[in-house]
């Protein structure tokens, strides 16, 4: 009995002397940034061809993608399924998303492609999250979505362009995911801080 008591005391003492390790739970924004940066390590061919995909949580094959797929995949890593959010909104407001086709009676919702179109993402953010649109480039922060016109989109990460206070962005402009300085044409940029979590 004395041996057992001595053993338990020794184990308790040893356990008390060890430094405690706490696991840090990542925020959704940290998950998004980690996934955007992880995409830089992947071999992805630029391919915007139409493909049937699952719904919900559908994605084109991991080895292909376009600029919107960088955003969609990054947000999905934090539990945000843009495919579902955008599909449901487009389905309920075709006249907003496709005004010309709506007038002609040819508008239709498509869960395979709508969320992969830059102009649809822009309209979705403007309509449902107008307070997320920011004006000044001084306000840019990691996790912000940057949209050029209706043709291109990327996301800022937590790495700065050397010698500046500007954050790099991740996008796919034709050669797979890449890290770039996004501030080359500020007049065309729209800037969103979208945190739907």
Q: For the regions a protein language model found, what residue spans apply to each?
A:
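A generic structural signal for short, solvent-exposed coil/turn residues
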Residues: 8, 146-148, 161, 183-186
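Sec-dependent signal peptide recognition
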Residues: 1-8
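N-terminal capping segments
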Residues: 19-124
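A structural signal for short, hydrophobic beta-strand segments that form beta-sheets
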Residues: 83, 156, 187-190
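Low-complexity, Gly/Ser/Thr/Pro-rich intrinsically disordered linker/tail segments
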Residues: 164-197
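...with weaker cross-activation on analogous glycine-rich loops/strands in unrelated enzymes
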Residues: 33, 91-175
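C-terminal motif of bacterial Sec signal peptides marking the signal peptidase cleavage site
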Residues: 14-15
């Amino acid at each position: 009995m004395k041996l057992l008591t001595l053993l338990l005391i020794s184990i308790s003492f040893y356990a008390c002397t060890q430094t405690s390790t706490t696991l840090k739970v990542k925020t959704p924004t940290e998950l998004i940034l980690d996934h955007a940066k992880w995409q830089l390590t992947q071999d992805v061919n630029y391919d915007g061809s139409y493909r049937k995909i699952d719904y919900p949580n559908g994605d084109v094959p991991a080895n292909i993608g376009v600029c919107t797929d960088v955003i969609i995949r990054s947000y999905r890593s934090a539990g945000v399924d843009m495919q579902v959010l955008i599909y449901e909104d487009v389905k309920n407001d075709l006249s907003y998303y496709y005004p010309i086709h709506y007038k002609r009676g040819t508008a239709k919702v498509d869960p395979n492609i709508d969320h992969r179109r830059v102009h649809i993402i822009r309209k979705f953010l403007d309509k449902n999250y107008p307070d997320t649109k920011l004006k000044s480039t001084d306000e840019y922060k990691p996790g912000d979505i940057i949209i050029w016109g209706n043709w291109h989109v990327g996301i800022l990460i937590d790495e700065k362009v050397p010698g500046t206070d500007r954050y790099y962005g991740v996008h796919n402009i034709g050669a797979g995911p890449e890290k770039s300085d996004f501030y080359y044409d500020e007049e065309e940029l729209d800037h969103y801080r979208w945190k739907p979590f």
